[in-house]
Amino acid sequence: SWVGGKKNLRDEVLARFPPYYERYIEVFGGAGWVLFHKPPGADFEVYNDFNSNLANLYRCVRDKPAKLKYKLRYVLDSREDFDLTSSLHKRGILPRLYDVDRAAKFYQLIRYSYASGLESFGSQPHSMWSDFPMIDLAARRLQKVVIENKDFEKLIRQYDRPVSFFYCDPPYFATENYYKDVGFTAKDHIRLRDTLLEIKGKFLVSYNDCPEIREIWDKHNIHIEEISRLNNLAQRYDGGCQYAELLISNYDTIERARAIKQLSLFD
């Protein structure tokens, strides 16, 4: 469960996509909750994440699913094995490995760590074999998806067109320390805003609701919508706990619903 993960909000996010675009770019891909929930269409799709281990994992899922599953067969659900892999990760050794070995070890850290935080063993029994059907489904979904590993500013400038739509789920404000592999700083929130304000296409950004973000995005022609979702981690201790979120865009997020209603008049 990634901090800010969109599993509990993805329907709300998709409902606010613009009615027309030809390029879909997921700038901070993470676990891909929105991409995998988004029906594949004729649009050109890009998944990006600055975490090179994560980008490599998705490339292996897309291009070498059989080899990845073969490696995962031999991953042990044990604290000792997890700690060995975690040590490789902390010492920066994973990028030196063969791509499939690297992907299998990083997936091990995601699957067996507490709250997918990569740090400590989660102690929850889980069979890797049970994930194989999901890996096959993900491989098929990713077949026509471009997978990038770039800084968000370079990516946005590269793919920006009038027909481009960027969905951004950046590290939440004041949670930057959680994303140790990414190095996202307070200044990057400003850099993201400045980059998006200059694009020709459209954007939708998900954020935690806080005064700092509201101030950063208090700009002309910027739409800010309040929304709430279940708090993934707090559910264990406080069932039904809600997490306040903001959806920020350079277009009217209601226009998609309006367009659907207009089309339905002629069905």
Question: Model features per residue range: what roles?
Answer:
Residues S1-G29, W33-V34, P40:
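S-adenosyl-L-methionine
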Residues V27-F28, N48, E148-K150, C168-P170, ...:
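Short His-Asn-centered micro-motif
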Residues H37-G41, A139, R157-R161, I213-H220:
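Short loop/helix-cap segments at secondary-structure boundaries that form the rim of catalytic
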Residues T185-D267:
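Long, positively charged, glycine-interspersed low-complexity recognition regions
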